């Protein structure tokens, strides 16, 4: 009886893992449809941003499934949902990322500070420059709690559940109105995911 239950559980785990792998593969394929557009726009601009990073950010933001694929409306207009076409979204996203990367170079901080600043805003780069010059989860969480959330109305440190493979090891929560302090780590993870799946697809 117990052996049968164990077999069923193992089978269920394998089926779930297979389904998730399939979904991730489909998401990667969707994101990769923007590769030519990203490549073209990067070639038009003097930028330290690279194709792999931009694609990983698209994966993180929307998995390529919305008009504003890089969720760049707010950086362009100060309001959300003002961009609804992919080209404008990617162009604005690259412009914002480029500004962050150049500011990060100027301040002597790491590239992942610039990536996290895509979610928090460029003032985060100054914060990291004054606190060790390297983006860490602890500093991102502190900035979310003490700067971003209060600025947007959450002065009590109120949190909400946030389930993600990275967050589950760090409390599985975010601050209300505090942005996403896991953002740069998610982009890094998604960069590796895209590399792995595209390598697998190429070799296959």
From Swiss-Prot:
Subcellular location: Cell surface
Cited Pfam families: Lysozyme_like
Superkingdom of source: Bacteria
Chief location bin: other
GO biological process: carbohydrate catabolic process
Gene Ontology CC terms, in alphabetical order: cell surface
InterPro entries, sorted: CwlT-like_lysozyme, Lysozyme-like_dom_sf
Protein name, as recorded: Pneumococcal vaccine antigen A
Organism annotation: Streptococcus pneumoniae (strain ATCC BAA-255 / R6)
